[in-house]
A protein has these predicted regions:
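N-terminal cap/lid segment of alpha/beta-hydrolase-fold proteins
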Residues: 17-54
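Mobile cap/lid helix-loop segments that gate and shape the active-site cleft of serine hydrolases
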Residues: 19-21, 25-31, 166-203, 209
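Short beta-strand element of the alpha/beta-hydrolase
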Residues: 55-66
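Alpha/beta-hydrolase
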Residues: 62, 172, 247-250
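Serine-hydrolase catalytic-loop signature spanning alpha/beta hydrolases and amidase-signature enzymes
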Residues: 66-69, 73-74, 93, 119
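Short amphipathic alpha-helix adjacent to the substrate-entry channel of hydrolases
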Residues: 73-94
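Primarily recognizes the serine-hydrolase "nucleophile elbow" in alpha/beta-hydrolase
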Residues: 115-185, 195-196
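C-terminal catalytic histidine-bearing segment of alpha/beta-hydrolase fold enzymes
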Residues: 214, 221-224, 228, 235-281
Length: 281
């Protein structure tokens, strides 16, 4: 019996899936002119899938927090768990920190998001990834950042990149009008509606990268409607690679945090979107 148990244990070890590799606190901004706050915040964690025969796709993921709060190490954001869950399926995940209001003002946090994406395109090949297959996304304020980087070509231009370098956008319940924190920085009301150069909706056009939008059936006030508006405007502009999913039995928080579970409908939708779009590039 002992010998049988030992053989079973050995067999289970042999067939066990290797765990993802995590590289922490990689600086994505450099130079001698960085402020102390930039040096503190402009770092990312890279979660790599087990070695594969083909270069893998990568998902740059921005957590939420209203552009005022959040950290890649904050337990309530579940960033490490989300990253590991996708990495086990063969998709690398990059989770950057970024500067926050009020220490930072618009467009500094958007520029940080663009810098993190650019770092990924330039460096993921050294880790086994395909730089042509770098996707971007996030939850809530993170979704807003992903949309701004993926919609406004001026954000990537300083890094010698363009929207063609964005393999796709998979965002979760992001703000599509000018973010309320930016409006507050300007002295405007939180629930006023503004769509200017700081709004993803301002940059809608036919030629944007492929887009997947997830939103909740019990989302925060106005957020589901904002995302539905974005979907409608993209389709109206002739953008043919627009897909969406209303994730039921979720609220504004759980729709993002549940992505750490492989069986979650949102997780499945994002994984399928990345695999399909990566195969097409």
């Amino acid at each position: 019996m002992r010998r049988l148990l030992a053989l079973l244990a050995l067999a289970s070890t042999a067939f066990a899936q290797p765990e993802p590799k995590v590289i922490k606190d990689v600086r994505y901004r450099g130079g001698d002119d960085l402020t102390g706050y930039e040096a503190e915040r402009c770092k990312l964690d890279l979660t790599l899938p087990p070695p594969a025969a083909q270069p893998f796709a990568t998902y740059v993921w921005f957590y939420g927090g209203g552009l005022k709060n959040g950290s890649k190490t904050l337990a309530s954001e579940h960033c490490a768990e989300i990253a590991a869950s996708f990495a086990r399926e063969g998709i690398a995940v990059v989770v950057p920190d970024y500067r926050l209001s009020p220490k930072a003002k618009y467009p500094e946090y958007v520029d940080d998001a663009a810098a993190a994406f650019a770092w990924t395109v330039r460096h993921i090949g050294a880790h086994g990834g395909d730089p042509r297959k770098v996707f971007i996304g996030g939850h809530s304020a993170g979704g807003y950042l992903a949309l701004m980087v993926g919609f406004d070509p001026s954000r990537l231009k300083p890094y010698g990149l363009g929207l063609k370098d964005v393999a796709g956008i998979a965002q979760v319940s992001g703000q599509v009008f000018t973010h309320y924190t930016i409006r507050e920085e300007r002295g405007q009301a939180r629930y006023s509606v503004t769509s200017d150069e700081a709004a993803p909706a301002f940059h809608v056009r036919k030629t944007l990268p492929p887009i997947l939008t997830l939103y909740s059936d019990h989302d925060m006030t106005g957020r589901a409607e904002e995302n539905q508006f974005l979907i409608a405007m993209l389709k109206g502009a002739g953008h043919v690679e627009t897909t969406s999913l209303k994730v039921t039995d979720t609220d504004h928080g759980s729709i993002g945090h549940n992505l750490r579970f492989a069986e979650d409908p949102g997780h499945k939708a994002i994984g399928q979107f990345i695999r399909q779009q990566a195969a097409a590039r």
